[in-house]
Every structure is written in structure tokens, then in C-alpha cells.
A protein has these predicted regions:
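Short, low-complexity, polar/charged sequence segments that are solvent-exposed and flexible
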Residues: 62-64, 85-88, 153-158
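Metal-dependent nucleotidyltransferase catalytic core
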Residues: 68-104
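Helical scaffold of the NTase/Pol beta-like nucleotidyltransferase catalytic core
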Residues: 1-43, 82-86
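Glycine-/proline-rich flexible loop or hinge segments
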Residues: 8-14, 64-74
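Catalytic cores of NTP-dependent nucleotidyl/adenyl transfer enzymes across multiple folds
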Residues: 8, 27-31, 95, 99-178
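Active-site nucleotide-donor binding segment shared across nucleotidyl transfer reactions
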Residues: 34-64, 69-70
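Short, conserved acidic/polar surface loops in the N-terminal third of protein domains
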Residues: 53-57, 76-81, 146-148
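Short, compositionally biased low-complexity segments
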Residues: 1-6, 56-65, 129, 161-168
Length: 178
């Protein structure tokens, strides 16, 4: 059923299926982060946020960039603990893939690759890693100003545009504020 939704959304929106699938997993991770009690400190930023939140261009990226607001005010190990907690919660159910030269987990910076259950396969060469998400979180960027925006996935947009709103709720694809 998921594969059918990905392929139908791909055809309707004229976006390659691998990007529809990756968008679902990026949006899922962001939704998990938004449900975190510390989500008010986690600011979605970078190129992917321009596409997902601000609807500027169709950027198909593999990374989720997060900045911790007021990171300089976190004393001692609190920054690292907060970053680790947010990363763990937003990647729930995904498998970390340790990549030499990519994976980095410092006191103020976290960068790790995660694999998701890819239903479309890995045979197609793409500009992004099929079946993987890169999560980057830091507490030294200055994420100001920022504004909360509604986020949803391409599959939900497809369901909405084809008058299938009931499927959005049925499959838990409701938009959320971040």
C-alpha cells in the first residue's frame, strides 16, 4: 500500500518516486522531533527547510539540519545530552549507519546517517543516498530569526489534491507545526 501511494503521488506530482519516499521519511523524522518536549529549542534550518517549510523550490535533499536555540546557554554536558535526546527521538525506528568521515558526535555537534526501510530499492543512481537520511544537529549556530511553519509530506499533499483527505488521517500523515 505504501509503495502504491509513493508511485501514485510521484505520477500526480511529477516527482521521482525515490524523492517521494525520502520526503516521507524526512517528514516522519521532523514530526517525531516536533513531538519532543524540547522541540521549542530545535530549529529546522538549511536547504531542506526552505523546500519543506517555506515551499521555496523543490529541493530534494538527504539531510535534516537542526540548530539548538540558545545553545550557548547550555552548561556542561547539557548541550550534548539535549542533542543526543533529540537525535534519538527523531530517528526512532531507523537504523544508524556509521559512515567513516561522516559520523561525528561531539559535545555541540551531531552528524549521523540513518537508513530507512526503502521499498523502491537502491539500483537507481541519484544525487541523494537512496534509503538513507543524514541528521545534523548543532548548538553553535545562531538560528534567529525563525518562524513556525506547517510541514507535511508529498504523499499527504497528493491525498489532499485528489480529495482523499480521509487517507491523511487514516495513515497518520497530518501536517504539524515546526
Amino acid at each position: 500500500l505504501f509503495t502504491d501511494a509513493v508511485l501514485a503521488a510521484s505520477e500526480y506530482l511529477d516527482i521521482r518516486p525515490v524523492y517521494i519516499e525520502k520526503d516521507y521519511w524526512i517528514t516522519r523524522s521532523l514530526k517525531l522531533m516536533a513531538q519532543n518536549p524540547n522541540s521549542d529549542k530545535a530549529i529546522f534550518k538549511g536547504g531542506t527547510s526552505l523546500s519543506k517549510a517555506h515551499k521555496i523550490g523543490n529541493r530534494f535533499s538527504e539531510d535534516i539540519d537542526i540548530a539548538i536555540s540558545d545553545g550557548d546557554s547550555l552548561i556542561g554536558n547539557r548541550s550534548k545530552m539535549l542533542i543526543k535526546k533529540i537525535a534519538k527521538e527523531m530517528t526512532y525506528g531507523l537504523e544508524e549507519v556509521v559512515v567513516q568521515g561522516v559520523t561525528s558526535k561531539g559535545s555541540r555537534y551531531y552528524k549521523a546517517m540513518y537508513s530507512y526501510p526503502n521499498v523502491l530499492g537502491r539500483a537507481i543512481k541519484e544525487t541523494v543516498n537512496i534509503g538513507q537520511l543524514l541528521v545534523e544537529i548543532n548548538s553553535f549556530a545562531n538560528p534567529y530569526p525563525y518562524v513556525s511553519k506547517n510541514i507535511d509530506c508529498f504523499i499527504a499533499q497528493f491525498f489532499r489534491k485528489t480529495n482523499n483527505e480521509d487517507l491523511i488521517e487514516q495513515y497518520g500523515l497530518e501536517g504539524f507545526s515546526l
